[in-house]
């Protein structure tokens, strides 16, 4: 499939000061005009939302984020505040939230660190340090352990080869090494999996996966499932999935956040907010292909109220 891109585009005829006034009016006095807030913010790009925030402060003398926080609540508030947060800072806040307090949201750590580009990871590291006065790596170390910790530390280094270069000999060697590290012996050399999956470029890895299948007579995903377990397994699978088809990986994250009883709203919100401008159309196409139903219909059936309204706009239509 050719990449289709995002659903949220910059609005034409954009006037930040006008939008700021509309938002103030929606929140002033008794009650809140949620529709007015949705109609402005859901139809603006992240960059435009930042301009609105500046215009709001300049022309009204109040902070838009603070006003939204005091007027809105629940999941609707969470989506709107997420949309108002600059992209890298949003990732940083989500990573922090995943590690703060008791318990760890391993899924969130894996999702962000396995799917972002090395350049994005480097920016995440800088912003995390500025925001919290300590490094992302230190927080990962204090919150996770064993091989799972090691794979996250490795991903958080942002050191993956970004070229398209394919060294045929190294590619064959990697495939052979992975085979020997797992399927071929009793016990698993987990570090080998980590080294290859966390440092090689995408083009190289796609060839490694093909060669691996030829040698092992099975997909690398099958081997990862039988050779590793727990969060370490989840992380390796996420890396492979993101290399093969990142939009399909996010489609699966969305599907799992909604299928069955209850909804994992944190994941649903994070993926919808962070992918709306990047590859939401591709995620939708993959969702339909994988699950036979549209993402739109899933969101519609799983959410309600203003929360549902804004998610459906980010989704951008039915398939």
Curated annotation (Swiss-Prot):
Alphabetical GO CC annotations of the entry are:
apical plasma membrane; chromaffin granule membrane; cytoplasm; cytosol; membrane; nucleus; plasma membrane; vesicle membrane
Q: Which residues carry this modification: Phosphothreonine?
A: 7
Q: Which UniProt keywords apply?
A: Acetylation, Annexin, Calcium, Calcium/phospholipid-binding, Cytoplasmic vesicle, Membrane, Phosphoprotein, Repeat
Q: Which Gene3D superfamilies match?
A: Annexin
Q: What membrane topology is given? A: Peripheral membrane protein
Query: What molecular functions are annotated in GO for this chain?
Result: calcium ion binding; calcium-dependent phospholipid binding; carbohydrate binding; chondroitin sulfate binding; heparin binding; phosphatidylserine binding
Note the SUPFAM superfamilies from the entry. Answer: Annexin
Taxonomically, the superkingdom here is Eukaryota
List residues modified as N6-acetyllysine.
213, 293, 300
Localisation per UniProt entry = Zymogen granule membrane
- Residue numbers carrying N-acetylalanine: 2
Entry-annotated residues carrying Phosphoserine: 12
Q: Where are the Annexin repeats?
A: 14-85, 86-157, 169-241, 245-316
Q: Give the free-text miscellaneous remark of the entry.
A: Seems to bind one calcium ion with high affinity.
Subunit-level organization: Monomer. Binds to SFTPA1 in a Ca(2+)-dependent manner.
Q: What is known of its domains?
A: A pair of annexin repeats may form one binding site for calcium and phospholipid.
Q: What is this protein called?
A: Annexin A4
What is the organism of origin for this protein? Bos taurus (Bovine)
């Amino acid at each position: 499939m050719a990449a289709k891109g995002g659903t949220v585009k910059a609005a034409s005829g954009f006037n930040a000061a006008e939008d700021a006034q509309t938002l103030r009016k929606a929140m002033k006095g008794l009650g809140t005009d949620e529709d007015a807030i949705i109609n402005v913010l859901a139809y603006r790009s992240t960059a435009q939302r930042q301009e609105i925030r500046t215009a709001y402060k300049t022309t009204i003398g109040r902070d838009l984020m603070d006003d939204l926080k005091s007027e809105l609540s629940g999941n609707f508030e969470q989506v709107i505040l997420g949309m108002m947060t600059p992209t890298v800072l949003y990732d940083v806040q989500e990573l922090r939230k995943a590690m703060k307090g008791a318990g760890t949201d391993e899924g969130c750590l894996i999702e962000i660190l396995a799917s972002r580009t090395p350049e994005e990871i480097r920016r995440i590291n800088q912003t995390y340090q500025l925001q919290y006065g300590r490094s992302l790596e230190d927080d990962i170390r204090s919150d996770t352990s064993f091989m799972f910790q090691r794979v996250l530390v490795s991903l958080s280094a942002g050191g993956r080869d970004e070229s398209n270069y394919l060294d045929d000999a190294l590619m064959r060697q990697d495939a052979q090494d992975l085979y020997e590290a797992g399927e071929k012996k009793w016990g698993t050399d987990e570090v080998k999996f980590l080294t290859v999956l966390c440092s090689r470029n995408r083009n190289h890895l796609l060839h490694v996966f093909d060669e691996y299948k030829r040698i092992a007579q099975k997909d690398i995903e099958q081997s990862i499932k039988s050779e590793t377990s727990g969060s370490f397994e989840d992380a390796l699978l996420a890396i492979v999935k993101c290399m093969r088809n990142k939009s399909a990986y996010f489609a699966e994250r969305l599907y799992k956040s909604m299928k069955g009883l209850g909804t994992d709203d944190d994941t649903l919100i994070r993926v919808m907010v962070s992918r709306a401008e990047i590859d939401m159309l591709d995620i939708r196409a993959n969702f339909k292909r994988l699950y036979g139903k549209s993402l739109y219909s899933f969101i519609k059936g799983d959410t309600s109220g203003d929360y549902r309204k804004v998610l459906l706009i980010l989704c951008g239509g039915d398939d």
